[in-house]
Swiss-Prot record:
Catalytic reaction equation(s): (2R)-2-phosphoglycerate = (2R)-3-phosphoglycerate
Root EC class: isomerase
UniProt key word Iron: no
Domain of life: Bacteria
Binding site for substrate: 7-14, 20-21, 59, 86-89, 97, 113-114, 182-183
Full protein name: 2,3-bisphosphoglycerate-dependent phosphoglycerate mutase
Catalytic residues (positions): H8, E86
Site feature Transition state stabilizer, where: H181
SMART domains, alphabetized: PGAM (SM00855)
Species this protein is from: Haemophilus ducreyi (strain 35000HP / ATCC 700724)
Pathway: Carbohydrate degradation; glycolysis; pyruvate from D-glyceraldehyde 3-phosphate: step 3/5
GO molecular function: phosphoglycerate mutase activity
Family: Belongs to the phosphoglycerate mutase family. BPG-dependent PGAM subfamily.
Length: 227
């Protein structure tokens, strides 16, 4: 069986080189075109889906919608869930990556961005931009809404959704599309493929490129490739 991942198209804060995380920003025109191209690639390659999973952030939802529209599958069920959100970058969210590197040093920022288990500076729950003040997450217990995450914590957040929804869908024979974010998809890929803590630092997923994971009937990883 095959599982398709798509990282959302290029966003407004990708263009501005800002840390984004759980902040909700839109796609750029380039991002829209990337999503259209991804949908057209899937259509040309004959990929059909029974269900699509995405996050509750605009850039991923719009990418999912565009991909499905371009591949003539906008009618299939979509599940939007906070567990597929991007990694929460804590106090770094909204900051310029270059300016942050100048302030703290390239090595420290690289560790914050790419280390598997180093947390960024945490955002105060009382901060106006905290997810605690966003009605998208008002139904959640306060203790599960993050104030900052590393990739390890992101995987711990994403894994229950894999086990409860994505894996059962695949095992039931459904063809699955997951349109999410660089780090939530990296976390899932780490689990599925078996990437080591060290190797995951250099594992990247480009925006708007369909990544196909080939799995056996028990969801063991066989191979991966981009369309």
């Amino acid at each position: 069986m095959e599982l398709v991942f798509i990282r959302h198209g290029f966003s407004e804060w990708n263009a501005k080189n800002l840390f984004t995380g759980w902040r909700d920003v839109n796609l750029t025109e380039r991002g829209v075109e990337e999503a259209k191209a991804a949908g057209q690639k899937l259509l040309a390659a004959g990929y059909e889906f029974d269900i699509a999973f995405t996050s509750v952030l605009t850039r991923a939802i719009k990418t999912c919608n565009i991909v499905l529209e371009e591949s003539n599958q906008l009618w299939i069920p979509q599940v939007k869930h906070w567990r597929l959100n991007e990694r929460h970058y804590g106090e770094l969210q909204g900051l310029d990556k270059k300016a942050t590197a100048e302030k703290y040093g390239d090595e420290q920022v690289h560790i914050w961005r790419r280390s598997y288990d180093t947390l960024p500076p945490l955002l105060a729950p009382s901060d106006p931009n905290s997810a605690h003040n966003d009605r998208r997450y008002a139904h959640l217990p306060k203790e599960v809404v993050p104030n900052g995450e590393n990739l390890k914590v992101t995987l711990e957040r994403v894994l229950p959704f894999w086990e409860d929804q994505i894996a059962p869908a695949l095992l039931s024979g459904k063809r699955v599309l997951v349109t999410a974010h660089g780090n939530s998809l990296r976390a899932l890929a780490k689990h599925i493929i078996g990437i080591s803590d060290a190797e995951i630092m250099d594992f990247e997923i480009p925006t708007g490129q369909p990544l196909v994971l080939k799995l056996d009937s028990k969801l063991n990883f066989i191979e991966k490739f981009y369309l």
